[in-house]
Amino acid sequence: MSRYTGPSWKRSRRLGISLSGTGKEIARRNYAPGQHGPNSRGRLSEYGQQLHEKQKLRWMYGLNERQFRTLFTRAGKIREGEHGTNFMILLERRLDSIVYRLGLATTREQARQLVNHGHITVDGKRVDIPSYEVSVGQTIGLKEKSKNLQQVKDALDAVTARPSFVSFDDNKMEGTLVRLPERDEMEPEIDESLVVEWYNKLL
């Protein structure tokens, strides 16, 4: 299954959350798209709730179904911690997500583009794979020429706070994953237990 590339605002309104992280799409129209949008959000069945939560999390991080399920399976093999929390941690450790958390991009989609276009370095070496798994202690930065990108400057100017599991050096324009995130530092809108329930029925 390919990654969804349709209108992100419609997708956000359908799910009822801001997938971009900006909140603009929900602030403008806080109901699902379509002719019956304002009245279309009824009570979901248990199946519907699980599917809704799975799609919400998958689209939030911009993964296709195969990538998403692979990470979920990996998380289940980690002996310590809860399956759902470990899954969330693996999602957060993706390079595109860390770039977003550092404030080098305003959305995960923009962060993914920065990685794909070769602007991002890990420990000084260019890495253009958004799914690259960042380890604690690794330093994420920009290629020297990329430090002048206006979109990066705008993103950094818009930063008001960063999660405490990353640190950032404003002078060097680089940051570090200092530790793994705690559950309360990750997406609060997600109930990952519903995602676990969904896949437990399938796998």
From Swiss-Prot:
InterPro entries: Ribosomal_uS4 (IPR022801), Ribosomal_uS4_bac-type (IPR005709), Ribosomal_uS4_CS (IPR018079), Ribosomal_uS4_N (IPR001912), S4_RNA-bd (IPR002942), S4_RNA-bd_sf (IPR036986). It comes from the Bacteria. Keywords: Ribonucleoprotein, Ribosomal protein, RNA-binding, rRNA-binding. GO terms for cellular component: small ribosomal subunit. Coiled coil: none annotated. GO terms for molecular function: rRNA binding; structural constituent of ribosome. Residues 93-153 form the S4 RNA-binding domain. The keyword Chloroplast does not apply. The keyword Plastid does not apply. GO terms for biological process: ribosomal small subunit biogenesis; translation. Part of the 30S ribosomal subunit. Contacts protein S5. The interaction surface between S4 and S5 is involved in control of translational fidelity. One of the primary rRNA binding proteins, it binds directly to 16S rRNA where it nucleates assembly of the body of the 30S subunit. With S5 and S12 plays an important role in translational accuracy. Belongs to the universal ribosomal protein uS4 family. This is Small ribosomal subunit protein uS4. It comes from Lactobacillus helveticus (strain DPC 4571).
